[in-house]
Amino acid sequence: MFGVELVPCIQTLAHLHNALKWPGMDKIRDSADILQPEKEETYQFIEKLLSSVKENFSTNRVHLGMDEAVMLGLGNYLKENGYKKGSLIIREHCNRVVDICRKLELKPMIWSDMYITANSTGGYYDLPENTDCSKWEKPKKDLGLVYWDYYHDDTRTYEKMLDIHAQLSDNVIFAGGSWIWNGISPNYSKTYACTKAALSTCKKYNIKEVLCTAWMDNGAETPVDALLPGLVLFAHLDFHGDYDETILKQEFRNCTDGEFDDFMALDNFDSLFLNTKENKEAQNPSKYLLYQDPMLGIFDYHVKEAGVNTKSYYQNIQKCMKECAKKTGKYQLLFSFYEKLAAVLSDKADLGMCIKSAYDRSDRAALKDISQNVIPGIICNLTDMKSSREKNLDERCKAIWL
């Protein structure tokens, strides 16, 4: 009942740039990251992929991907076959791959967006309410459709999307997410706002299965352990009728050996300009203020406009992270890394503005202090931060794999 089933998630249409860039893949390439449908070589390749899945996993379930193939049929396919509606291509491609799954006794699912975007003229979430899908191309009944949404905090959007999915399939799964792809630090306020709205609607629509994704877009810079508050929230809402933070905190402690409030403090890194408001727009100043060249000051305007004292703001976070690191042995490396990040940001976030201000005032003493003390201090903290991140990564990988 409470076992863990490892389900492989692969790609059998798009998001295959790293594979398709090689000359040996020329025959099955439609465009840079999309397989060419309706070629026997393509399905021979996919069958080999699925045979490997069958051989190496105990489950018979498999996620086939197939999302975001926006240029489907518009590359080599177009040159060789002429234009064909994307909705027909995706249906026929799905049917071929599902046939392979049946042959191998696998139960497939795919991301649902191509069945919506290929059947309409808008984006995935752009369809109006009460959209009639009766004339759309639809998947086979044994192909699961996974509706993915990590962005909306209003139940109305989820209701609209689930109404559309109900017209396409009786086999609908929902995928939300724990936002560890915001930058260097997690975005829990967006995770919680979206997940509460999503899962309450899924219950209303009697959706039997939900997934918590933890994507690693934009560099995979956030430590994986930071996904835990989002993951525990999914479990909490699955087992309880309503959200109860008191119960959630106890569940978090029981399941992770961590303190909920300590983890939630990580949300502050990107709340610099929000004044305690939720980070629903996924701002990530902790990333761009870390990486920006202080002599260019591309993002200095945001700091000036907000009138925020970045030094004291990140110094307070540094103190908080230091205390969190002391309290827990299991996550000491995680909070130590964020302590070092806060130390870097406390001096670097406004470095360019400090240099410019001192230069405009002809304040040689201030410039000398920045040159001889502040910048070397930042470099030292950066070195410590890098070492801490590498140590955290090393320890977590050893714990999982060795």
Question: At which residue positions do the language-model features occur?
Answer:
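Substrate-binding groove of N-acetylhexosamine-processing glycoside hydrolases
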Residues: 3-5, 43-55, 59, 79-402
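Acidic/aromatic-lined carbohydrate-recognition and catalytic surfaces
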Residues: 1-25
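Short, solvent-exposed loop/turn and secondary-structure capping segments
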Residues: 17-21, 75, 121, 157-158
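Active-site groove signature of glycoside hydrolases
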Residues: 12-13, 28-80
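Short connector loops/turns at beta-strand edges and beta->alpha or beta->beta junctions
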Residues: 21-25, 67-71, 178
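Short, solvent-exposed turn/loop segments enriched in Gly/Ser/Thr/Pro and often Arg
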Residues: 10-17, 65-69, 114, 214-217
